[in-house]
From Swiss-Prot:
It comes from the Bacteria. This is ATP-dependent helicase/deoxyribonuclease subunit B. It comes from Clostridium perfringens (strain SM101 / Type A). The heterodimer acts as both an ATP-dependent DNA helicase and an ATP-dependent, dual-direction single-stranded exonuclease. Recognizes the chi site generating a DNA molecule suitable for the initiation of homologous recombination. The AddB subunit has 5' -> 3' nuclease activity but not helicase activity. Its EC number is 3.1.-.-.
Amino acid sequence: MGLKIIYGRAGTGKSTFCINQIKKKINNSPTNKLILLVPEQFTFQTENKVLNAIGERYVLNAEVLSFKRLAHNVFNECGGATRTIMGDAGKSMLIFKVLEDLGDNMTVFKNASRQKGFIDIASKTITEFKKYNVNNEVLDLTINEIEDENLKMKMEELKDVFNEFNSRLHEGYVDEEDQLLLLNEKLDGCSLYDGAEIWIDEFSSFTPNQLSVIGKLLKKAKSVNITLSIDEVNSPKVESDLFVATKNTEKRLMNLIQEEGIAFNGYINLNEDIPYRFKENKELAHIERQLYAYPFKQYRGENNSLRLYRANNNYDEIEFVAKDILRLVREKQYRFKDISVICREVDNYEKVISAIFAEYEIPYYIDKKIDIASNPLIVFINSAVDIISKNWTYESMFKYLKTGLIKEFRGIEGAELIDELENYVLAYGIKGKKWMEEWVNYSSSILKEEEISEENKQRLERLNDIRETIVTPLDEFNKECKGKKTLKEFAIILYEFLDSKLNIMDTIDKYVEYFKENDMAIEAKEYSEVRDIFIDVLEQAVDVLGNEVMDLDEFMKVLNIGLSQYEMGLIPVALDQVNIGDITRIKSRGTKALYIIGVNDGVLPSASKEEGILSDNDREILLEKGISLASDTRTKIFEEQFLVYTAFTIAEEYLVVTYPLADFEGKSQRPSIIVHRLKKILPNVKEESEGFKLVNDKYDKISAKIPTLNELMIAIRKNYDGAEIDDYWKYVYDWYLREPKWKERIEYVRKGLEYTNLENNISKEKAKKLYEDNKNKISLSVSRLERYAQCPFAYYIQYGLKAKDRKIYEFTAPDLGSFMHEILDEFTNEIKEKDLKWSDLSKENCKNIINSLVDNQVKNNKSSILNSSKRYSYFTDRFKRILTKSVMVISEQMKRSDFEIYKNELAFGFSKDVNSIKLDLPSGESFYLNGRIDRIDKLNLDGETYLRIIDYKTGSKKFDLNKFYNGLQMQLLVYLDALINNSENIVENQAMPGAILYFRIDDPILKSKGDLTEEEIKSEILKELKLEGLLLDDVKVVKAMDNTLEPGTHSLIIPANMKKAGDLGKNKALITMEQFELLRKYVNEKMVEICQNMIEGKIDIEPCKENKNIVCDYCNYSHICQFDSSLEDNRYKVIPKKKDEDIWKSINEKVGGEVNGD
């Protein structure tokens, strides 16, 4: 009976020493038990190491145990397993319920207890109390002595939570920490390990409970041998000492044996000048000795074992690591299993490592736990509950359907059904109660109902069948979950919904079978394990809280808290693979080469300063009162230092340290202090980078097949552009050509060099077929011509190939425009029927008529989007206000004008008022333009008839002569020309142009420094909604448009002003009759030019760019053309900024002679 301490620095062979001792004992055929006790996470690795060292004989004579396994053995042999051990899930669910019940009585933690993550913090605190033997009596005594009121209140509430938790737990359970307390009790009367020889390895510290167990074992065992990673024993305590944690452990062990009267069998010192691990490697031995030495010594010998790499980013970093691993395997005959990659934040690196290692064909295993929240079963359960608790939202419904767990929606056919369903749901705004109703709408408009075709009726029938399949089980589930029930009742309802109604468990079994048959071990394990976890959590919840009454929301909170405690470990799929993991989880297990990545400031060593519920100051006060708990943040800094030391001493032969200059988001990063330290203790080490690599030969770019192919592409591109490349690339190219698997890819590379996204023109015949209607006529609107002028290719995609965006149930700008135009048209008809004049309308008139028209429009179209929600009801009220304000402004404009409204919504084409505008092309074809003029005003003056066109716009718009010149704003001039040409038929005599104007439909917000009078408000509104466009430069005509315009004033309703002399002020909105003629002639020629290009099949990818305005920014087809201005052949059609006088000159040069009769 006695304690022996085996000590040595990292790499001195402490673990090997223990195994060798066990081997010697086995060779002497022992009759007593031989036990190797290690931390839980290292049991599997240690068993393998012992098996490799000793062979199968070890199984019969020795055991590798953790404290948990030790307890299990004792309870099985000597009793004590009467109460079930509650797992982390049950523990968290119980803590949640305790916090819920105590929450209203809390002060300090009242708000925090409801926050996400607090349960984990509370659970850790409870665990900490138990680990450090803090019980109710200890808490009572300590709280009475605490003077700090805040800490006192905090400890009172923690005590309440702690006691309530234990009270409920111990009704039938114990937790893992209780296990050690129970183990302490049972060991006294248990002879299982009497006379055993025990080795305890890989611990740097022990909790008080673990120390108690060791104390009991010391009394029963023949010998207990404990390894500690320290440089020397019996040394004075120095807080900054690298080995301070293990030296504290040594001191506590010595105190323990003194208190218990146990013999000390001495120390075994494994420290030598060069540790066992580094016998053949002076550089790594120097790092072990000097990394944290003060003062330090420098090693100036040749360096072959350490590399430092400064990466541009994480991708560059991991690619460097991948290339170097392949070099070790190919040139140095390393096995992949001899190599490890470690970092501080493995989650951040997982994706980039997976992608790059796959490219380089490096087998690897990431030693990490994965969250189960994204598994289809967990997603399915949560989305099913979300559907009924969040009123059948689109997001929850399609999460539910896309899990692949409902048999009707599995496979390709199932995915197609979901796509069809999703398209309908998005197009018609299906949510809430609409899922429970038969779907009858198939209108193309979101504002009006339409007659449904037979084809669409059949689609609706099929969609309704699908809807029924989905809704029936969910509706039953919804009804069963209503109101409050016990947790057990909810658990039964949920499980029956999954298993009996939808056969989800059977579906999961089929997936597992499929994965196994297709060598998908990871997926098979995940699906199988998550199903078992779900059932286990459900059972734990029922056991712990089964009789608690709650609603569905609270039940799901409990369930998800339980599920959140589970993570799955990944399975190593091969024996020979690179081991990747967190720096805290990977220990030295025959690691010849080690890559430590992400060695950045604040990352390694970690700068975390999370204190938890109890701050460092709280812990100091509690320590003074006799409660010793886990380390404070200051102590953790030194523990982190020891962790770094341990990591940097894992490698036996080769160490690579890398750090990126930028993180995954592109933010700059600095190297860790460790990098600077390495440079100081090994001054001959050269820091490498993309521009400088020590292992740098011209064949460096030839590695694995995919990366080499990528480099080959770059070389081919350089050669294609005329640059010199190395000769060996020709042989690389030939190799890929000879390999059938790669030949096709090389051909793609070659074609890629010749690739251009420019489209060849289509034939005239094809253009006619694409653009002609069913009457073999090419009919289109002016806005479509403008669209072609913006970008011929976009026009071809939209109107030639008829590409359509996915229809979404939303109120868009075009919908708003249509709605406003229709109401204004109905308003005009209404006042005409009532024999009212615009100039006689009052505010009350306007408001009442508009309200009535809008209400009727919405009421008469039940499927209108404006009936769909309260949000759209608000929009409807807002539209009423805008329209009322607009018609009041129109009324005021008409009061001030001698022009009269002659006609609204005059249609060209559409078999209505006036024939289509016919354009005859030089090539013999004809185009027909259709359109609709919002409003025509007429003035009879001095025997002449003047017309002005008003176009209603829901956004701000002004006439831009430059856009007009380039074919981007032709509409009003086209309408004016057609109106003048047909005026004898329309207004019964030849008319002349008076104006083309835009009217903005709006309810403007006025900005003013002070209060405004009623009259000032009216003037400001008129000014804000002033008509914009072009006017005939004739003082009589302009005065007729605003009869309030006086000398020396500016008009509030049109873009004009009058000088004091009575003539019109200079204004680019004013143009002469001759200029109107020029514009009319030019617009016709421009339209013919555009139509000629269209019929000739020109579909150039040539988007317009005007200053910073680029058509592509608002184009839905840019992903099709893949226009890229950096490509040689991709060019914008730049609209240069010109002065109006220069544009007029250009127009005059083009068509002036024709207007003047030349």
